[in-house]
Each structure stands twice: as C-alpha cells, then as structure tokens.
From Swiss-Prot:
<keyword id="KW-0999">Mitochondrion inner membrane</keyword>
<keyword id="KW-0812">Transmembrane</keyword>
<feature type="transmembrane region" description="Helical; Name=5">
    <location>
        <begin position="223"/>
        <end position="239"/>
    </location>
</feature>
<dbReference type="InterPro" id="IPR018108">
    <property type="entry name" value="Mitochondrial_sb/sol_carrier"/>
</dbReference>
<feature type="transmembrane region" description="Helical; Name=1">
    <location>
        <begin position="17"/>
        <end position="35"/>
    </location>
</feature>
<dbReference type="InterPro" id="IPR023395">
    <property type="entry name" value="Mt_carrier_dom_sf"/>
</dbReference>
<feature type="transmembrane region" description="Helical; Name=4">
    <location>
        <begin position="184"/>
        <end position="200"/>
    </location>
</feature>
<feature type="repeat" description="Solcar 3">
    <location>
        <begin position="216"/>
        <end position="312"/>
    </location>
</feature>
<feature type="transmembrane region" description="Helical; Name=2">
    <location>
        <begin position="92"/>
        <end position="108"/>
    </location>
</feature>
<dbReference type="InterPro" id="IPR002067">
    <property type="entry name" value="Mit_carrier"/>
</dbReference>
<keyword id="KW-0677">Repeat</keyword>
<protein>
    <recommendedName>
        <fullName>Mitochondrial thiamine pyrophosphate carrier 1</fullName>
    </recommendedName>
</protein>
<dbReference type="GO" id="GO:0055085">
    <property type="term" value="P:transmembrane transport"/>
</dbReference>
<keyword id="KW-1133">Transmembrane helix</keyword>
<dbReference type="GO" id="GO:0005743">
    <property type="term" value="C:mitochondrial inner membrane"/>
</dbReference>
<feature type="repeat" description="Solcar 2">
    <location>
        <begin position="122"/>
        <end position="209"/>
    </location>
</feature>
<keyword id="KW-0813">Transport</keyword>
Amino acid sequence: MSLKGDRLKDEGSRLQVTAAGATAGLVARFVIAPLDVVKIRLQLQTHSLSDPLSHRDLHGGPIYKGTLPTLRHILRSEGITGLWKGNVPAELLYVCYSAIQFTTYRTTTLLLHQTLGEGTLPPSAESFVAGAIGGGTATAATYPLDPAAHALRRPGQRSRVCESVARRGPDWVVRRAPVGFFGVWDRAWAQIIPYMSFFFATYETLRPHLSELELPFSSSSAVARTMASVMAKSRTFPLDLVRKRIQVQSPTRGRYVHKNIPEYYGGTVGALRTILQREGLRGLYRGLTVSLLKAAPASAVTMWTYERALKFYSGVGEKGEEQRL
C-alpha cells in the first residue's frame, strides 16, 4: 500500500481499516486535548471582548482573551492536568468514532462502486458522499459519549459540575438519559456531516496532486490534511459553536466556568439568531483561531497515524497469510 498517491478508499480490509481508525483516534485525541479544552472555554464565553461594558454582569467566571492567555489561565488555576480534563470519555469517544468513521467510509465507497459502477461518480463526489455517511454514522453511534466528555472538560477548579467519571458518571447518566444524550443529535449531524464531507472530498482531491510535487520531508500528505481541515472547519464553525452552546442547556449551566450562558430557543436556527443579536457576526466565530489550531494538527495526526497504522496492520495480515501458505 502506498501512502502517496493512492486514495484511502482503495486501501486495506475492513478489519484493518477499523483497527487503524481506532489507533488513529486514540493517538490524535491525546495530542490535541489541551487545544480542545481551550476551544470549548472560548466557545462558551458569550460576552463581547471588545466592549468592556458587557463584562458588568459577569459574576465569578474568568474572562478569556485569546488562545495563549486562556492556556496560561488554565495552567495557573487548574494545573497541567486541567488541559486534559475529561480525557477518559473523550479518548473512548475518539477511538470509537474514528473506527466507525473510517470503516463506514470504506464500506460506503465499495457500495457505491457495486451499485453505480466504479468511476461513475467523480472522485471528489464519491469522497463527499462517503465522508458524509461516515461522519453521520459515527456521530450517531458515539453521540452519548460527546456530551459526557464535554461536561467533564468545561468546569473550572472551584465549581465542578462533574469531577470524574467514577464519582459523577452514574448520576449524570440518570439525570440526562435518554434526552440528555440525544437532545442535540440533530445539531451534531448538522455540523459533522458537512464538515466530514468537505474534509474528505478536499483531502482526496488534493492528496494525489500534491504527491506529484517534490515537497520537503515528503510532506505532501500533511499539507493536504492541513489544507482540507482548515477549509472544512472554516465553513462549518458556526454550527460547531451552536452545538457546544446547546449542549450546556441544563439547570446546572450557571455552575460552569462562565456563569452567564443564556438559554437558546428554536433549535439551531433560533440559537444562531440569538447569538447574532447579542454578540454580532463575530460571536459565531468565537474560538475559531484555536479551533483551526486544533483542527489542523488533529486531522494531520489522525490521518498520519491512520495511514501508518493501516500499513502496519496490512503488513501483519500479509505475513499471516504467508505463514499459513
């Protein structure tokens, strides 16, 4: 298997793809956890950074200004472990999500070939459809883990809504299930399906072309991953912000780091309208910088690990077949 010009949909068996996807999710989650914590803190901040008067009604919660100041504040107030807050359920989420996503992506591609014939759809359209179905299926299967991990990542040191999976997990399940698990499922789909569609379509399109260039350190795949991630995240970021805001809509939202999180009515459209009215257009892109800083390495690490894990598992499979012969 080549890691240069071949397309992901043409590589590996189903079991190898599943194992490689799980490995990629495990590694990627640990690497980008600190940036994810910072991103969520910024996304849940509803006051204007440019208007000091908007800070008058804040009580107790810190005011985060930018990626590095937020990072320093978390380190100072919560220690280095605060940057990996909620990482246990998040690791489980990423492992399951990545395994299901890559397996579904591969399976969908094969079904499209069998149903429509190979080469009927343009490669970018094929990747767009497979990416949408892969992302949607993985989101549906793993969504209960998302609000659990999100709840554990957002509290501060002195006002913890969930202190640990062992201590607060059972109580959280009783209070939130089943509506709390799936209450914003549609918002998750609305964000992840277009994101994964754009990402895989862009990545699969750029990857073969960039592999023909003589880039230093054989970085063509890394460049393709980074470009695809930045483009996809920029297009869908407001939907991700709305999903995070709606996930904290519970009676305990006043106990989080930010005390002034408003209630949103009318679903995704209503939340978008409320944010535009209260915070302006800039409010829809709060935390975009750190999100892009997170998305680029997250996608790069995920795809890099996936490709090499797939190569490893494929090699193991080939050796096993040779030994049986």
